[in-house]
Amino acid sequence: AMAVLTRSSEQLLARHDQARAIQVAETVISSEQASAGQQRVAWTVLAHAHFDLQDYLQAESAYQQVRQRMSPTSKNYNAINERLAASIYKQGEAAQASGDTVAAVDHYQRVRQATPDASIVATAEFDAAAGLLAMQDWTEATAVLERFRNNYPNDPRQGEVTRRLAMAYLAKAQPLQAAREFERIGRGHADPKLRREALWQAAELYTTAERYPAAVGLYRDYVKQFPRPLEQAVEARQHIVLHHQRTNNIREQQRWLNDIIQADQHSGTQRTDRTRYLAAHAQLTLAGHAHQQYRHTSLTLPLKKSLATKKRLMDNALQQYDHAAGYGISEVTTAATYHTAQIYSQLGEALLQSQR
């Protein structure tokens, strides 16, 4: 009798009569006369029928029963495991559709716990992370996203994972981690505009995290890869100048100051008030360096030779200040005029001291 009922439940399921298939399968399951094999078949019919009726909670419970009655090496084990994973995942989808993000995330995360080998685990993890981000649970979201990155390195969604990690670390106020994610986008994204914006943001975040060499490296890359728009590229050069000023690397500072001047000078219609302003200040700083060199060169015997050197350095400094004043930026012109007068006064003092 049990064999007939078991077969009958399978036939009813095949005819898509899920309601009667469930009734017959439950009769077999509750009978003490049913063999282990018949019980397993009945549980399988019950699970499939509930799944077909979109009763995923009951389907999950039944698939768990089927799986317990199977050896992991048996032929249908993987198929049952996949269906169990799908039953849990579908509960997550339903919760999400009804607006219950907390429950949805819980279901998505259960997929990995219950069926770690199922093919849908990656999607469940990805969707769990999306829900956690929506809930602003940044800590758990970053943990899930980092795990996804490590477990599925070849997944086509890795680019989106990086973008989401960047935003989550930014929201968590972890500038160093956020910088690393934006740098990934800046180096790997297909869209040049997005790459440009990400590189810039990464450089700013490295600065916030006080990782100055990393920031400078990215600003250099930015100038190389994105010379246009000009204004932003000149701003990048200015950041590099400020870094070398902080570290007292005069040679590199002068190199990038010259680069600012050249970039502004040779850019025609791309020039803006801001690039002219930065170029004027760059020229004023270079003039200041020339002025220092002139000031610190003493007049010594034989006077004729040292005076010629001093005069050459003086002419260079005067020329540099003249270039700075030529930009027509009032504060720069004022400073250049003041320092020009200083240079002449300092020559007089140097001559008086040498005669003593």
Question: Which residues fall in each region the model found?
Answer:
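Acidic, polar-rich low-complexity tracts and alpha-helical solenoid repeat scaffolds
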Residues: 1-356
